[in-house]
Amino acid sequence: MDTLSKKPEQRPEEITAILSSLDRYNPEKISILQEYATTQCADQHSDIEANLALLKLLQFQQQPNPNKEDIICNILSMALANFLTSDFTTALHVLPSYVLDSPAADTLAESIQKLFHLYTLLDGCRFPEFWAVYERDDAHADITADVADFENLVRISITRAVDISSQAIHKDVFRSWLNLSDNKFADYVKELGWKVEGETVVVPPNKENEAKPATTTESIKIEQISRLLKRTNE
């Protein structure tokens, strides 16, 4: 899912002006872009284009920035919650390659490697394993803490994955994917407007999950038909 080509509705005009001009390379705009990234965390939306511009500026920032590590982790955490998009890998490619080297060179690399491990689990649809790993280490919650309602944002993305790929899913499987108790799961499904029939959660049909018949069209010229008919009459 491409998010770079779409301008978020929440993007302020000031940010649009920066991104559409040479100011996107101006270190003096770091504070504005940092503040916008913080707003994204609080408002639960992600603007990957603005965040990529910020990451690039942070690479070459000469002045000490005590918020640098937190900002980078926040951007990656927002991208992690939106794992159905390419935001996480796109942001990762802007960062220095050493951040994934083992052993971790510094605390930033250590945090990024933890987030990367979580991303591989989500990207591979290994959702129960994701929750187990996430809850096993308190550091994960600390790294993602600035993203408001991070866990629920992940659940929304998991739900979206089910919505576009399935017409039905076993209730226990879906509940384990969301990591919810029975009562909270029942409320969650009800809020979605989906139905539970026996042990199955029925996903409403949509243009992504509907079965489509495959059609093949072949172009045959009149001359080919004429030659074929001629051979059958010989």
Curated annotation (Swiss-Prot):
PCI domain segment(s): 46-219
GO biological process: formation of cytoplasmic translation initiation complex; regulation of translational initiation
GO CC list: eukaryotic 43S preinitiation complex; eukaryotic 48S preinitiation complex; eukaryotic translation initiation factor 3 complex; proteasome regulatory particle, lid subcomplex
Keywords: Cytoplasm, Initiation factor, Protein biosynthesis
MF annotations from Gene Ontology: ribosome binding; RNA binding; translation initiation factor activity
Subcellular location: Cytoplasm
Annotated PROSITE patterns: PCI (PS50250)
Function: Component of the eukaryotic translation initiation factor 3 (eIF-3) complex, which is involved in protein synthesis of a specialized repertoire of mRNAs and, together with other initiation factors, stimulates binding of mRNA and methionyl-tRNAi to the 40S ribosome. The eIF-3 complex specifically targets and initiates translation of a subset of mRNAs involved in cell proliferation.
Quaternary structure (record): Component of the eukaryotic translation initiation factor 3 (eIF-3) complex.
Protein's UniProt name: Eukaryotic translation initiation factor 3 subunit K
Gene source species: Yarrowia lipolytica (strain CLIB 122 / E 150) (Yeast)
